[in-house]
Amino acid sequence: MPSIVTVGTFDSDNVADVTKILREFDGEVAPGLPRLRRRQVFHYSDLYVHMQDWDAADADEAYRLATADPRCARLNDSLAAYFGDHAPTPDWDGPVDRPTAERFYVWPAEDVENLELTYSAVIVNTQRQEHNAEVARLFAESDATDIPLTMGTLRRQIYLWRGIYLHIQDFAEPDAIKVISAVWTEGDPRFLQLVDDLTRLIPPYDPEGNSLATRFYHWAAEESK
């Protein structure tokens, strides 16, 4: 079940207005979109991150499902008053015409059952496209160990859009900060080495804050039944 992820500028003062729009849509329209399984929206610094999970074979099919239905198009029109376009980061070295973030790493390769019942955490940094292979290699080596099991990670996806790096993890535990903090407290040297290796590849988006985005909206298909 691929995630369609869009990113742009956002003023967090508008959280209530955006939440109202989404609640109305997902309460009235989403139940008629049986292949839409989950929607989550996060804010971080001056950004929004809008994630949609669709029951689709791949990201291309999911994108068609998310954009072809005129009801979804009307929702996007309503959100456009609050979700703005974001220019590429200064050192971005990739395309600027993609409508959604590109996923370049996923673990595990198999679908996760009942994914809509999990809780997502989004870490925001920056990255150049040329580093995709190295970042993917580092995570693949780590995910081949027991670290994901110890951390409680059920799925890991990494996306890139105009230089904005998004590390998305799905957990059974609702408190992402608690889960992530526990890993730091335990101090597994393999995890700390991974962080050190990644630091040179994924500089912070906001050097003044932490990298964890705040989820302010969530809807899952089961909740509509």
Language-model segments: which ranges?
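Accessory, usually C-terminal, subdomains that scaffold auxiliary metal cofactors
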Residues: 186-193
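Short S/T/G/P-rich N-terminal loop/turn motif that feeds into the first structured element of a domain
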Residues: 1-49, 53-166, 170-186, 200-225
